[in-house]
């Protein structure tokens, strides 16, 4: 398939670190150990976010023990078959992860899990690509994300970098053929749709009921442009579709990703970044609905950095998540902040001051 992907880099603008520093807070529950199951690494002309950058964020006060990298069209191979170019991203991230695992850069282990991209629309032929990604992943390669975010109502909203249709998850026969290979190889699947596409994921999850799936970013409730004046309508339809999706026991959900422009909260337009109280208040209807629908054992908080860094700092974000989980028990917090992610991605258990790895 000729050039099946667009690049994310053209959509990223440099972040304003001076602005982000205007809101600082004491760290809440600093003793709570956290796995961040969703962040990116890249070096685009518009913005750089590599190992030292993520470590600066994870080292800002919360006890982040390990992280999971999600594909973002970074460091693709420059030559070779088009279908195999995303293998370069796995090679790059495995190198960053190996640097982190050396212990030279602190105790947080970056990218103990790697989620890459392969074009599942290749059908059964995608197995060759997946096997090569597993081979170069150093034991860290966990699965695939193939985004199907699609909106034709608001010109400011970009469709997914995989160039999907509105119903790729639901009725693309070649995609389904490739999707079936994930189970054969024991790989996970990250899904990303806007709220209008949640029913297509529900259809996919029902068709492949044994495939572990996690929906990113609370299912993408839109609030930009056309959707800005329809927030109540969006919340109602989103809530209905999230509850229906949660009936699929093979599906989990990531709690976060609400600080992007498409969500329409516009925190990035303010003179000062929001406090964790303000973030928690804005996000509560979405986060609480997800936790109620899926339960703590099928829900995990995520940073989605540096994309969500548009709206606030890493320290403030995790403070907001802790505020949102304030009523949870210790066991429920362990699930939401750590164990659900560890189980889904088959991550190592890390012990001691040097984060010794034990399976």
Predicted features, each with a name:
Residues 33-44, 215-218:
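Histidine-centered catalytic micro-motifs
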Residues 3-22, 81-197, 203-206, 219, ...:
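Active-site gating/metal-coordination segments in enzymes
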Residues 30-33, 62-66, 106-113, 137-142, ...:
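Short, well-ordered coil/turn segments that N-cap beta-strands
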Residues 44-109:
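Alpha-helical scaffold segments that flank or form the walls of functional sites
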Residues 38, 67, 93, 114, ...:
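Conserved, mostly hydrophobic/aromatic
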Residues 1-33, 49-57, 65-66, 285-289, ...:
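Mid-to-C-terminal alpha-helical segments outside catalytic/metal-binding sites
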Residues 4-6, 10-12, 165-300, 311, ...:
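Catalytic pocket-lining loop regions of alpha/beta-barrel enzymes
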Residues 40, 73, 119, 147-149, ...:
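Catalytic metal-binding/acid-base residues of hydrolase active sites
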């Amino acid at each position: 398939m000729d050039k099946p992907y667009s690049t994310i880099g053209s959509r990223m603008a440099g972040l304003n670190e001076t602005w982000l520093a205007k809101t600082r807070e004491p760290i809440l529950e600093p003793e709570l150990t956290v796995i961040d199951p969703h962040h990116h690494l890249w070096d685009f002309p518009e913005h750089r976010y590599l190992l030292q950058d993520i470590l600066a964020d994870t080292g800002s006060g919360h006890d982040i023990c390990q992280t999971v990298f999600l594909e973002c069209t970074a460091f693709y191979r420059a030559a070779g078959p088009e279908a195999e170019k995303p293998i370069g991203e796995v090679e790059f991230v495995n190198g960053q992860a190996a640097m982190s695992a050396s212990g030279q850069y602190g105790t947080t282990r970056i990218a103990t899990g790697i989620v890459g991209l392969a074009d599942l629309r290749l059908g059964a032929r995608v197995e060759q690509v997946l096997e090569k990604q597993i081979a170069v992943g150093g034991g860290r390669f966990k699965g695939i994300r193939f985004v199907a975010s699609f909106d034709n109502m608001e010109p400011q909203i970009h469709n997914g970098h995989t160039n999907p249709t509105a119903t790729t998850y639901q009725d693309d026969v070649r995609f389904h053929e490739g999707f079936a290979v994930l189970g054969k190889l024991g790989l996970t699947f990250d899904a990303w749709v806007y709220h209008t596409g949640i029913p297509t994921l529900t259809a996919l999850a029902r068709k492949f009921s044994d495939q572990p799936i996690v929906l990113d970013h609370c299912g993408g409730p839109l609030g930009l442009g056309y959707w800005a004046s329809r927030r109540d309508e969006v919340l109602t339809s989103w809530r209905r579709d999230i509850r229906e999706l949660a009936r699929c026991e093979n599906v989990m959900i990531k709690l976060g990703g609400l600080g992007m422009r498409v969500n329409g909260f516009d925190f990035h337009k303010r003179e000062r970044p929001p406090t964790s109280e303000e973030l928690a208040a804005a996000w509560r209807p979405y986060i609480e609905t997800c936790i109620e629908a899926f339960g703590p054992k099928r829900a995990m908080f995520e940073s989605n950095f540096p994309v969500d860094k548009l709206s606030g700092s890493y320290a403030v974000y995790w403070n907001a998540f802790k505020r949102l989980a304030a009523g949870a028990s210790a066991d429920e917090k362990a699930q939401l902040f750590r164990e659900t992610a560890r189980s889904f991605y088959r991550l190592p258990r890390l012990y001691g001051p040097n984060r010794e790895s034990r399976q």
